[in-house]
A protein has these predicted regions:
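Accessory alpha-helical DNA-binding modules that contact the DNA backbone or grooves
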Residues: 1-159
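ASCE P-loop NTPase motor cores of helicases and related translocases
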Residues: 120, 124-127, 148-196
Length: 196
């Protein structure tokens, strides 16, 4: 069948637009992973997804439904001398742990639980992994609340971590509630309000 000029240009444009996805497919298939992940990777990581995966194969974990073993397989395929102690791997495990907790309804996790998850995945220096995740801007570290008495120091065991987007949202909500509480006027005497 004959293809008109306009249709040929559309087909060619579509082919060029899909080029980043084809590059990702090449990486994934080379690592023995399903090619069907490529569209999601390209959507999540953008037009330079293949380069980003070559630089940090554990970025694959930013997609839902991808397991650590898949990202490790990709790392072995694209990195010479891939190492389980790589800080990029540790940073990705921190993010994966927090995303998993978020799906279960926990937007903030105690740092001790994140350390335990890192150790369970064989990360020998979990503190470095957490620092890398915080420095990347994807994770927020929340300081423990100040103790009621002036003499006590905050308990470092109460440090928590969250994904940045949820941590910032919760902080904004908390600030708004504090502002409302500070400016609100009482509309009824507490004694006149019946308990529920």
């Amino acid at each position: 069948p004959r293809v008109g000029r306009q249709r040929a240009e559309r087909l060619f444009s579509s082919f060029l637009a899909a080029q980043p996805t084809y590059e990702v497919v090449e990486l994934l298939v080379g690592a023995g992973l399903a090619a069907k992940l490529a569209a999601g990777v390209a959507d999540t990581l953008g037009p330079d997804a293949a380069r980003r995966l070559r630089d940090d194969p554990w970025a694959l974990l930013s997609l839902s439904g991808v397991a650590l073993v898949d990202a490790d397989r990709l790392a072995i395929a694209v990195l010479t001398g891939a190492d389980r102690q790589d800080t990029r791997r540790g940073r990705a495990i921190v993010g994966l742990t927090l995303r998993t907790a978020t799906r279960a309804g926990h937007t903030v996790l105690p740092a001790d639980l994140v350390v335990a998850a890192l150790q369970a995945e064989g990360i020998s220096d979990p503190v470095t992994a957490i620092v890398a995740a915080v420095e990347s801007g994807d994770v927020l570290e929340h300081e423990p609340p100040e103790p009621e008495d002036d003499e006590g120091e905050p308990d470092p065991a109460l440090r928590t971590l969250s994904l940045a987007r949820y941590g910032m949202a919760e902080e904004l909500v908390a600030e708004a509630i504090a502002r409302l509480m500070a400016t609100a006027e009482r509309i009824a005497d507490p004694a006149s309000v019946r308990s529920v």
